């Protein structure tokens, strides 16, 4: 229900619970508990929650609902807004996250297997979130296609996502737009395994990555995103228009998965994303 290595039989009846700095509580009942909203049953039944302690060290995260049971999983960072019925993700501080991780690890090369993530998302007050940031990046990542590695055990995982969909404050003078940031190869360019590659041309930012402008981010409504992976292709539709269709044959040896929520790449602020819709779909023979 909460964490796979915790055995807490009375968890569903307590009003507050915590682990390693992450606390779930809803004492006044003002927050909507995501498990109680049928419109999010599809995504919750396929996902676990990966969430940081906002007061913890950079990069920290804990794992919850590994059995897809989100009963009692609600706090000021993860809840449903009772008025708008949106699934809300919040997180403070740099390189911290609050994301649903779809548990299925899938092949990207099969010609008749397609994996799709649908989302209608509004990023709330991002400029205010970054008003005091000292980062040069100033991004909020809210959708991802990442990889597990060669197998479900995580062998030879590549520590770079295939895709990040971000709100970016400023990209060479283009302000307040959504961007698709895609990895153009499967080369490891950081960490101990990336030391031999990091200074090579294939790890240069302009070679290893592409940034595709997905258009200005509205400040008063959500935006529809459809991400589909299959048949060695990554496709992204925004408000029903195809924005990206990319051959990803170079990714075929890696098992991939979806993530949705918020991942901060800015300092001294808090991100907030409202998902009016969030669904996962698999089309196979």
Curated annotation (Swiss-Prot):
GO terms for molecular function: poly(beta-D-mannuronate) lyase activity. It is an enzyme of class 4 (lyase). Its EC number is 4.2.2.3. It comes from the Bacteria. The keyword Zinc does not apply. Coiled coil: none annotated. The keyword Calcium does not apply. It catalyses: Eliminative cleavage of alginate to give oligosaccharides with 4-deoxy-alpha-L-erythro-hex-4-enuronosyl groups at their non-reducing ends and beta-D-mannuronate at their reducing end. InterPro entries: Alginate_lyase_2, ConA-like_dom_sf. Keywords: Lyase, Signal. Disulfide bonds: none annotated. Residues 1-20 form the signal peptide. Belongs to the polysaccharide lyase 6 family. This is Alginate lyase. The lineage of its organism: Bacteria, Pseudomonadati, Pseudomonadota, Gammaproteobacteria, Vibrionales.
């Amino acid at each position: 229900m909460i964490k796979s290595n915790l055995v807490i039989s009375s968890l569903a009846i307590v009003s507050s619970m915590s682990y390693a700095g992450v606390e779930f509580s809803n004492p006044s009942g003002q927050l909507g508990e995501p498990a109680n909203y049928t419109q999010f049953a599809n995504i919750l039944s396929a996902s676990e929650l990966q969430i940081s302690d906002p007061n913890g060290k950079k990069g920290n995260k804990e794992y919850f609902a590994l059995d897809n049971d989100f009963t009692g999983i609600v706090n000021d960072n993860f809840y449903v807004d009772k008025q708008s019925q949106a699934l809300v993700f919040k997180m403070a501080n740099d390189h911290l996250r609050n994301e649903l991780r779809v548990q299925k690890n899938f092949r990207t090369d099969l010609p008749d297997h397609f994996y799709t993530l649908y989302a209608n998302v509004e990023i709330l007050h991002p400029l205010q979130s970054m008003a005091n940031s000292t980062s040069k990046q100033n991004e909020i990542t809210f959708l991802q296609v990442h990889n597990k590695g060669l197998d479900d055990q995580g062998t030879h995982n590549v520590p770079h996502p295939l895709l990040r969909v971000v709100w970016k404050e400023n990209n060479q003078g283009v302000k307040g737009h959504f961007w698709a940031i895609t990895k153009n190869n499967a080369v490891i360019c950081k960490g101990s395994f990336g030391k031999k590659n990091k200074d090579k041309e294939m790890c240069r930012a302009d070679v290893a990555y592409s940034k595709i402008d997905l258009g200005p981010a509205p400040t008063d409504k959500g935006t529809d995103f459809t991400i589909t992976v299959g048949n060695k292709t990554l496709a992204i539709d925004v408000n029903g228009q195809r924005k990206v269709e990319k051959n990803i044959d170079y990714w075929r040896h890696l098992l991939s998965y979806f993530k949705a929520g918020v991942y901060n790449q800015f300092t001294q602020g808090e991100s907030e994303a409202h998902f009016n819709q969030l669904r996962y779909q698999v089309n196979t023979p």
